[in-house]
Regions:
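Sec-dependent bacterial lipoprotein signal peptides
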Residues: 1-21
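Extracytoplasmic cysteine-anchoring/structural motifs
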Residues: 22-433
Length: 433
């Protein structure tokens, strides 16, 4: 058994901080017939760190994000129901002309395309001042929901538009799902999920939920809004991919040694919808099984050659992306998925697992279950949690260590460690057996 320890400080939180000050105007013309009056909100909106995905291949764990669709939705609860069994915040549509057309306020300053903001700004968080003056009605507690996406300029979006009905949709029930087109495409190939995060008003010191009560005397309030990921991140950074592997598919009559033409990472179960507030899959969410989340094309057209002596796939280093010689990285985002949605592996062991690596030449198959390094719980079958990063290999500004698949390849079964990185800066040990 060989043990490697790679220490690295990771920061994958995608956080938005809104410093909010609120003052009610004394101008009577700022009052509507229902008693709503204009309330000025001055915000400092910031996004820090993150990971990139999809066609925007991940280059590093360090902060790099592409937020170009930042929205703020308003929800409210009658003051008399606050703290009772009937407490519920329902969607409140804005009345201002531009916001009313869309149903939300837009922070236009977030307009990233390429390059990724923090990667090109000394890894510093993106922040913008933002001011709105919504009409808010007396006698209600107001909660502001921020939703950030990165698909503003994408032709075929993979996420649906939130459908909120005024005075009906509850904050706890607000959800976003993959589009039907995205789900149908995923069944034929790779499932891609865009970057998505959200958050609501919190007390700046305690970080507890802190809705705002609006009355005639409302003059000023100060809050923060910290948004974290609604999706999970996946990074697979590997090197020295074996050029010959042995088949181990369930039902195989005999073992066949073959040269793979592709290597994929697969989730045995993945949901297609998420509750925005709870950051988890709703009970009635549809799920996909045995879904490919990323594939490495091992053919010459992708720059690979076979080294018959070392019996590995070779590829020139990518200095632009910072990939070592003979290495490659794939990444994606995933909807949070409960453990109960996971299926059995397609290898001969047929044990339940969350992720596996799939080698194939189109005819033969090898499935290597992926396990996470943990001291408790099931190492193979575990939930996919929002705002967590599931990674194999290490890459940041200070560490560049892809996972060596040849060194840890075992013909019978490879137990690949996968580290779960919480969405806070923290030092971890990556241990491979």
């Amino acid at each position: 058994m060989k043990r490697i320890s790679i220490k690295n400080s990771l920061n994958i939180i995608l956080a938005t901080s809104l410093l909010v000050s609120c003052s009610a105007s004394n101008d009577t013309t700022d009052t509507l017939a229902d008693g709503s009056h204009a309330v000025k909100l001055e915000m400092r909106v910031g996004v820090s760190a993150g990971v990139v995905t999809d066609s925007r291949e991940l280059d590093t764990w360090d902060g790099a994000q592409q937020v170009n669709d930042m929205r703020i939705y308003v929800f409210r609860c009658p003051a008399e129901k606050k703290g009772t069994s009937e407490e519920a915040y329902t969607y409140c549509a804005p009345v201002e002309t531009e916001a009313a057309k869309k149903g939300y306020y837009t922070v236009d300053a977030f307009d990233n395309r390429e390059p990724y903001y923090s990667a090109e700004h000394q890894n510093m968080p993106e922040q913008h001042s933002y001011t709105i003056e919504p009409y808010l009605q007396n006698g209600y507690y107001y909660q502001f929901l921020a939703i950030g996406r990165d698909d503003k300029y994408v032709t075929n979006k993979v996420l649906t538009e939130p459908k909120f009905t005024e005075n009906v949709t509850k904050l706890e029930d607000a959800r976003i799902a993959l589009t039907e087109q995205a789900k149908n495409s995923a069944k034929l190939g790779i499932l891609n999920t865009t970057e998505l995060f959200s958050g609501i008003l919190q007390d700046e010191k305690t970080h507890e939920e802190a809705p705002v009560l609006v009355t005639e005397e409302t003059k000023y309030f100060h809050r923060t809004l910290t948004a974290s990921r609604n999706v999970a991140g996946l990074m697979i950074y590997v090197e020295n991919i074996p050029a010959q592997v042995e088949s181990n598919a369930a039902g195989d009559v005999s073992t066949v040694t073959f040269t793979p033409t592709s290597l994929s990472v697969v989730a045995t179960g993945i949901t297609t919808e998420t509750l925005i507030r709870q950051k988890q899959a709703p009970a009635d969410a549809d799920s996909l099984t045995y879904q490919t989340l990323g594939t490495i094309d091992l053919t010459p057209s992708n720059g690979w050659t076979v080294d018959a002596t070392e019996n590995i796939f070779k590829r020139a280093e990518d200095s632009q992306k910072g990939w070592k010689e003979n290495s490659y990285m794939i990444s994606n985002f995933m909807m949070p998925t409960p453990e109960g949605k996971m299926q059995k592996s397609k290898n001969s062991a047929e044990n339940e697992t969350t992720f596996y690596l799939h080698y194939t030449d189109g005819t033969h198959h090898r499935y290597d279950n992926i396990r996470k390094s943990t001291t408790t719980g099931d190492k193979f079958k575990f939930p996919i949690e929002a705002n967590h990063l599931y990674c194999l290999g290490a890459k940041s500004k200070t560490v560049n260590q892809p996972y060596d698949l040849k060194e840890y390849y075992e013909p019978v079964m490879t137990d690949v460690n996968i580290e779960i990185e919480p969405a806070f800066e923290k030092r971890h040990d990556f241990i491979t057996e």
